[in-house]
Design a protein with these regions (language model features):
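Surface-exposed, interaction-prone regions used to assemble/regulate multi-protein complexes
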Residues: 1-129
């Protein structure tokens, strides 16, 4: 599970005690020349707990954005980024960290990281549902 591979994940484990990788959108990926990256994971699964400042699920928001920071430790592969959509996220633990992969038709995303740090949450209502 992706949350288990993040440091600083205490709040996230309360928000989502179960697996969230079956339907995640990689909403943002950026990388700098030093190899640090930001990845935003959009989750359209209702959280296990209510957080008052976010409002009511399904009324005020229906998507949770998990903001993370990582350090690239190997390959980065992105093809057909604009075809990205909600899809299963595969997370594989390695000796050097983790590999995160998502594939949907021609869209393909794969990144090798030495680690992933939870940075924060934002929420929004996508107009669907």
């Amino acid at each position: 599970m992706i949350i288990d591979e993040m440091t600083n994940n205490v709040f996230l484990k309360k928000l989502y005690s179960g697996d969230i990788t079956s339907s995640i959108l990689i909403g943002r990926f950026s990388i700098d020349l030093s190899g640090y990256c930001d990845i935003d994971f959009h989750v359209n699964k209702k959280p296990d707990i209510s957080v008052e400042k976010y409002g009511v699920w399904g009324v005020d928001y229906n998507t949770v954005v998990i903001k993370t920071k990582g350090k690239i430790s190997g390959d980065v592969l992105i093809t057909e980024w604009l075809l990205n959509s909600y899809k299963e996220l595969n997370v594989k633990k390695t000796d050097n960290g983790i590999i995160i992969k998502s594939k949907n038709g021609k869209f393909n995303f794969s990144v090798e990281l030495s680690g992933l740090i939870f940075q924060g949450i934002s929420v929004y209502y996508d107009g669907e549902g």
